[in-house]
Amino acid sequence: MPDKHIHIVSFDIPWPPNYGGVIDVFYKVRTLHRLGIKVHLHCYEYPGRDPASELNEFCKEVLYYPRKTGILYALSLKPYIVSSRRSEELMKNLLKDDHPILFEGLHSCYYLDDPRLAGRIKVYRESNIEHRYYFNLFKV
């Protein structure tokens, strides 16, 4: 039986698992690992959360991308939390194979509808109703 793989695009580094969203991501990664699924974890760096070697125990690979902050990323039709997590390096890594992709939270969804990922199994998992909050913030 061939190995099973999955890409998980996380909005933050899920170590230590010490607040809501990253708790969910971390235990999902650990559970998938225990089920024999090879996890390719893609994390956006965020102030106060450093790359974590602890994640290597549960992942085939852990890749880190800088979050791009500043006014330029706020001038987008996409929410700031999404546009500031745009990374062509992430896209290059996702295009190396055809494994399914799990986008964790609205933050990580910049490439969800990218035509380069057409035909790929993609799952968007929201942990809150952030889309409502940001839509109403946009209307104001």
Where on the chain are the PLM-derived regions?
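N-terminal subdomain of nucleotide-sugar transferases
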Residues: 1-61
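Acceptor-binding helix/loop patch of EC 2.4 sugar-transfer enzymes
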Residues: 69-78, 122-140
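Short N-terminal targeting/anchoring amphipathic segment
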Residues: 92-110, 121-123
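Glycine-rich nucleotide phosphate-binding loop and flanking beta-alpha elements
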Residues: 14-15, 107-110, 130
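A conserved catalytic-core segment of Leloir-type glycosyltransferases
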Residues: 41-92
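Short, conserved loop/helix-junction motifs that constitute active-site signature segments
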Residues: 33, 115-119
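Short, charged/polar "capping" segments at the starts of alpha-helices
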Residues: 47-53, 110-112, 132
